[in-house]
């Protein structure tokens, strides 16, 4: 009985966290989705951004009490501007997606929304990129990936 309870707890925890991608797996996937070089932003920049925004967790969420918004998914896309979570006041939903769709493991909607963000604001829209990636040697983020 205890084993069944423990297994249930483990599976519930896994479902809540979603898929934590490996660094190179993430790099390969977003390259397939043509994010590498988009607006001259290198693949290493995107990998660095995802590392510091979500730790490569597709289901990551972070609540921002100031504007009552939430950041969603592996790229931590914000509900105040970019998606609809049904609870953020005055949400713009510029990407025309439900925020939960930005947490899908295939990354298609997250990447499409990221392209829209870059079209409008550039990669500087992400605070973690400005703080952890901008102006740094990012070669380590693609090391060993054989892309």
Swiss-Prot record:
It is found in: Secreted. It comes from the Eukaryota. One of its GO terms (biological process) is defense response to Gram-positive bacterium. It catalyses: Hydrolysis of (1->4)-beta-linkages between N-acetylmuramic acid and N-acetyl-D-glucosamine residues in a peptidoglycan and between N-acetyl-D-glucosamine residues in chitodextrins. CDD domains: LYZ_C (cd16897). The active site is at residues 53, 71. PROSITE patterns: GLYCOSYL_HYDROL_F22_1, GLYCOSYL_HYDROL_F22_2. Its EC number is 3.2.1.17. Disulfide bonds join 24-145, 48-133, 83-99, 95-113. The keyword Signal applies. GO terms for molecular function: lysozyme activity. Lysozymes have primarily a bacteriolytic function; those in tissues and body fluids are associated with the monocyte-macrophage system and enhance the activity of immunoagents. Lysozyme C is capable of both hydrolysis and transglycosylation; it also shows a slight esterase activity. It acts rapidly on both peptide-substituted and unsubstituted peptidoglycan, and slowly on chitin oligosaccharides. PANTHER family: LYSOZYME C. This is Lysozyme C. It comes from Trichosurus vulpecula. The lineage of its organism: Eukaryota, Metazoa, Chordata, Craniata, Vertebrata. The gene is LYZ.
